[in-house]
Design a protein with these regions (language model features):
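RNA-binding accessory domains that recognize and position tRNA/RNA substrates
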Residues: 3-7, 15-174
Length: 174
């Protein structure tokens, strides 16, 4: 489930009506950006918690295991990019399947977020979990391009931003 803001200037209807807002007639997705320390920017749509976050940008090419990766303490302070094109399709399993009792990444980047999990053991969808844990997440067009950029230019700091400014943060200096 994506986050939305009310667009009172929407030309398709009367956005002062409560029923129009509830029906989604006046909603637009919240946009954010991943900004790398070399100035490269990737724009995307939020599906996590809407707040700025900074860290080292890393990637994982695994096809499954995103709940385990997000709760893995070795990813603490990092913005995790998942390169597999479909993330969220099996939802979030029970806590007993996690690596730790909380999410450790400082942000998540994917290319195709699925908000309707289809696994019998799913307890919630990924976006809901990220919002509950206050972790920002963006769906960008091409995680392969981002991964190639990191591979070519080496380790890179980044930040997920919406409208506010935050400094870059290097978790390796803690």
């Amino acid at each position: 489930m994506q986050q939305y803001v009310i667009d009172r200037n929407f030309s398709g209807g009367d956005c002062s009506r409560h029923d129009a807002i509830l029906a989604g007639e006046c909603l637009k997705p919240v946009q954010g950006s991943l900004l790398l320390e070399d100035g490269t920017m990737f724009e995307g749509t939020s599906f996590g918690y809407e707040r700025a976050s900074a860290g080292e940008v890393v990637f994982s090419t695994g096809m499954v295991g995103y709940p385990e990766s997000l709760t893995d303490p070795s990813f603490a302070g990092q913005i995790l990019t998942l390169t597999y094109p479909i993330i969220g399709n099996y939802g979030i399993p029970d806590r007993s399947m996690w690596e730790d009792d909380k999410i450790h990444v400082s942000g998540l980047i994917v290319s195709n977020y699925i908000d309707t999990p289809s696994h019998v053991q799913s307890s919630m969808n990924l976006g809901t979990w990220l919002r509950e844990e206050k972790i920002p997440a963006l769906e960008i067009k091409d995680t392969r391009l981002l991964t190639k950029h990191i591979r070519t230019h080496g380790t890179m700091l980044g930040k997920i931003v919406f409208d506010e400014y935050i400094p870059f943060y290097d978790p390796n200096n803690d």
